[in-house]
From Swiss-Prot:
Cytochrome P450 monooxygenase; part of the gene cluster that mediates the biosynthesis of sirodesmin PL, an epipolythiodioxopiperazine (ETP) characterized by a disulfide bridged cyclic dipeptide and that acts as a phytotoxin which is involved in the blackleg didease of canola. SirD catalyzes the O-prenylation of L-tyrosine (L-Tyr) in the presence of dimethylallyl diphosphate (DMAPP) to yield 4-O-dimethylallyl-L-Tyr, and therefore represents probably the first pathway-specific enzyme in the biosynthesis of sirodesmin PL. Pathway: Mycotoxin biosynthesis. Heme binds at residue 410. This is Cytochrome P450 monooxygenase sirC. Its main location: membrane. It is found in: Membrane. Its cofactor is heme. It is an enzyme of class 1 (oxidoreductase).
Length: 470
């Protein structure tokens, strides 16, 4: 997220930073010197010459780790610096936008914006997601988007609605298998929200891309997902994994990542070859044909499937399970939504497509109360912006929103909404649910503090609704 002035002098800048790092190691002077250097080189001021404020650089990753693992807390405390402030991702500044008028000014030309390379997350991250659709720009983005778009359009998502509704109901019918005490036949079961519901969006998206999967393939794919989750937990910790040195040092994180990349590649290629031998077609075989024709690269396909499947496992799980948890903690709203669903039983497809229902508003409210990330994937404008009175140079990275703005909105946003409603509707028809004791204390829910998104770690009591949903 460098200023364009210094894009033309990477060697000089690297030498200066390297010298400062050496001083840090040898004399313990680095933080003071480095902070002075960064403030000088990336100075952003308003018309009165007042510099843009923000937290001081924290060795060695700036605010990178805090942004991911303590984002909710820090998003409040850092606003003490003002409605527009600066944080550091290692040695790269990111400007954080919080006011609607600045959002409007920044996204006015969103079609020209550039995503940060590998989301400013470093070298090891780039090995699994560096070439994915969400993090590439320009002509590359257009090529890859064109290859994947046919499988995720609004029209296609609407056509899949009856299927996804049936799949959601089937999943809820079997959710008792995740009972924490093994009481699968009981009228009341206890579930962990994430453990019980995360597989539904994962395998639904997997079968959109891969086509029908056998039991062995599903088991293998889920093992890959668990490995991917472990890798992400280590990546957001920063440190040596940001640099290629992690490979030369053969760190355990690098070894695990290399194993995942090889196993993931093998799984995908072998499945595509199997489908072709059997005379079957799927989005996967279509994408491999695009690779053979040279329209996209294999890495672009693999990384974008990874983005849609593994990276978005936590994303969709977050939205779905927080909606369930929040409804569980607000029984009055839960009953109103349940009554609304019952009143629309004769035409659930139309009901699920509507944007003016309490169900839809509840989903939006859960996104507001429990946003996916306090800070979003950084992107940059291609011209200077005046925000809250500060002139921010082009190519400085910004943080903001949920599904994005303009043509770069999330590829699967329509499908994601349908998947979430496809679980919520049968769940509310079949169960009343509430939080178990000690899951919500002093205004705080139990959460997984190791994940890059703030997943809940909440257990629920699920009581079956008598036939008829009364």
């Amino acid at each position: 997220m460098e200023s364009i002035v210094y894009e033309t002098q990477p060697l000089l800048r690297g030498m200066v930073v390297g010298t400062i790092m050496l001083l840090c190691y040898r004399y313990g002077l680095a933080l003071s010197i480095l902070q002075l250097y960064l403030n000088f080189m990336y100075r952003i001021t308003n018309e009165k010459g007042k510099p843009l404020r923000g937290p001081e650089f924290s060795w060695p990753d700036g605010q990178t780790v805090e942004k991911f693992l303590q984002g909710g807390q820090k998003s409040f405390s850092w606003q003490a610096y003002g409605p527009l402030y600066r944080i550091w991702t290692v040695f790269r500044p990111e400007v954080v936008i919080t006011r609607p008028e600045d959002v409007k000014a920044f996204f006015f030309d969103s079609h020209t914006h550039q995503k940060a390379a590998s989301s400013n997350a470093g070298w090891l991250f780039s090995q699994i997601l560096g070439d994915c659709l969400g993090l590439i720009n320009g002509e590359r983005w257009s090529r890859v988007r064109h290859a994947f778009d046919p499988f995720f359009t609004r029209k296609i998502s609407a056509q899949r609605l009856p299927h996804i509704m049936a799949a959601g109901e089937g999943y809820v019918n079997e959710v008792h298998q995740y009972d924490l005490g093994g009481k699968q036949a009981a009228s009341t079961i206890n579930l962990n929200a994430v453990d019980a519901f995360q597989r539904f969006p994962f395998f639904y998206v997997a079968e959109i891309i891969y086509g029908p999967l056998g039991i062995t393939e599903r088991v293998e794919l889920w093992k890959l997902a668990e490995t991917h989750t472990n890798i992400f937990r280590r990546l957001v910790q920063g440190g040596i994994h940001r640099y290629k040195a992690t490979k030369f040092l053969s760190t355990s994180a690098y070894k695990e990542t290399a194993h995942f990349v090889a196993a993931w590649r093998q799984f995908t290629l072998e499945l595509a070859q199997k489908q072709l031998r059997e005379g079957r077609t799927s989005p996967l075989t279509d994408l491999m044909a695009e690779v053979e024709d040279g329209k996209v690269t294999l890495n672009e396909v693999l990384h974008t499937i990874d983005e849609s499947l593994f990276a978005n496992l936590d994303v969709t799980t977050h939205v779905l399970t927080w909606a369930i948890v929040l409804l569980g903690n607000h029984p009055d709203v839960q009953e109103l939504v349940r009554s609304e669903i019952k009143a629309n039983t004769n035409d659930l497809e139309t009901y699920m497509n509507r944007k003016d229902t309490l169900l839809h508003y509840s989903l939006l409210e859960s996104l507001r109360v429990r946003p996916l990330l306090a800070f979003t994937i950084p992107e940059s404008a291609q011209e200077d912006k005046v925000l809250s009175g500060y002139r921010v140079p082009k190519n400085i990275r910004y943080n903001l929103s949920t599904f994005g703005f303009g043509p770069r909105k999330c590829l699967g946003q329509h499908m994601a909404e349908n998947m979430i409603k496809a679980i919520l509707v049968p769940l509310l028809r079949q169960f009343r649910f509430k939080l178990l004791a000690d899951q919500y204390k002093n205004g705080e829910y139990k959460v997984d503090k190791t994940n890059w998104v703030t997943l809940s770690d909440v257990n629920l009591e699920m009581e079956r609704v008598p036939s008829g949903g009364s």
